[in-house]
Amino acid sequence: MPPGPDMTLELACGQAPVCGVDEAGRGPWAGPVSAGAVILDPDRIPKGLNDSKKLSAKARAALEEEIKDVAISWCVGLASIEEIAQLNILHAAGLAMRRAVEGLAVTPAFALVDGNYAFKLPCPVKTVIKGDSLSCSIAAASILAKEARDRIMIEADALYPGYGFAGHKGYHAKVHVEGLRRLGPSPIHRLGWAPVKAALAAAAVNGELDL
């Protein structure tokens, strides 16, 4: 098993404090995109940190609580479906990241950002491919971003039943396609996305929509 993330990249920045930044929700067909920004205390690193996608829901929930308790500062930023439509998903993710960093109680000297795109943030940026598997700060940010977005989608399931948002969180799933074909788009669907268009087009042809 490969080793988990550590603080090597944070220390290599040569400046402090360093925040980790990561997003959640670039791929779904519905809901906002979220981003977490976390400045960890090097002396209080939660055990078990890793890429949020590699953790169980129970582990993520426990780590989210611990991260918020021990971090020097943390914040989650969002970009709405309207902003996604206006800016495109890449730049909307960057907007969510900027909001997360700007919301920190402590101004970071440096930001480690997951991926290979250097978004414009309120501090110098270093991109890290697969950063959520390498950097504790990025891993922590990925957990906060995912947990925050998952809660939004669970709430959306109660507001807009029939799509299965609580289960798939807006991603591709059979129940999601069936809901779109039967009900049409909800107010939180990303209407410009090809899978949404395709499901609606198929429903129109087959007369499946409950209008």
Swiss-Prot record:
Q: What is its EC number?
A: 3.1.26.4
Keywords for this protein: Cytoplasm, Endonuclease, Hydrolase, Manganese, Metal-binding, Nuclease
Could you say which residues form the signal peptide? none
Annotated GO biological processes are: DNA replication, removal of RNA primer; mismatch repair
Primary localization class, coarse: cytoplasm
What does the entry's cofactor note say about binding and number? Manganese or magnesium. Binds 1 divalent metal ion per monomer in the absence of substrate. May bind a second metal ion after substrate binding.
Top-level taxon: Bacteria
What's any one GO cellular component for it? Answer: cytoplasm
Cofactor or coenzyme needed:
Mn(2+); Mg(2+)
What does the record give as the reaction this protein catalyses?
A: Endonucleolytic cleavage to 5'-phosphomonoester
Q: Which Pfam families match?
A: RNase_HII
Matching InterPro entries, A to Z?
RNase_HII, RNase_HII/HIII, RNase_HII/HIII_dom, RNaseH-like_sf, RNaseH_sf
Q: Which Gene3D superfamilies match?
A: Ribonuclease H-like superfamily/Ribonuclease H (3.30.420.10)
What the protein does? Endonuclease that specifically degrades the RNA of RNA-DNA hybrids.
Q: Which family does it belong to?
A: Belongs to the RNase HII family.
Q: What is this protein called?
A: Ribonuclease HII
